Amino acid sequence: MENVQKKPEIIVFAGPNGSGKSTFTEILCPPQMDYINADEIKKNLKCDDLEAAQIAERQREAYLSDKREFCFETVLSTSRNLGLLNRAREMGYFIRCYYVLTIDPIINVYRVKARVASGGHDVPEEKIYARYDRAMALIPQVVAVSDICHIYDNSEEEPFRIFKKQKEVCFYDVCDDWQREKIETLTGITDMERRDLNHRG
């Protein structure tokens, strides 16, 4: 029997500022996988945002060149990291995405303010709104490049998974804020099957 080599994997935690990506990362990033994060770089090296972002980008590119596995967190509001994921897939990487969003950017604004009050990093309000709109508009491309993609609405106390792509098969789940038509618009996917993605019993 032929030995099939496992593809190298990238795990990406994506979504607008203040959606709650970091909480997902803490729980779901495998301990054996290197985690590349600009906020951590900024804190450790005491550099500014731009320098930290540039260092993180160089690290991701270096890992990609060496075909090494890694995990990273991104707002994904521009095509830069989307381009990296597309290149990675062409190189034979397996792409796993956890996308964390909210139903309204005002939630993100308040969460960032709460984070700052607790000593966390700030993001200007106008940037949160602008990035939210751009990030949401790119979701169909994120879904397309991912081998596995989970989308969670993290507006409430408990996150609610509204969508899952497993290879080429897609599933959705509904709640008050998310019905099928809205999930189709968000993801660009119309061929999907309803499934309990939240183990409600």
Predicted regions and their residues:
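Conserved glycine(s) of the Walker
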Residues: 20
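Conserved substrate/cofactor phosphate-moiety recognition/catalytic segment
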Residues: 23-70
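Residue-level recognition of beta-strand->loop/alpha-helix junctions
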Residues: 37, 74, 99-101
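NTP-dependent small-molecule kinase module
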Residues: 143-201
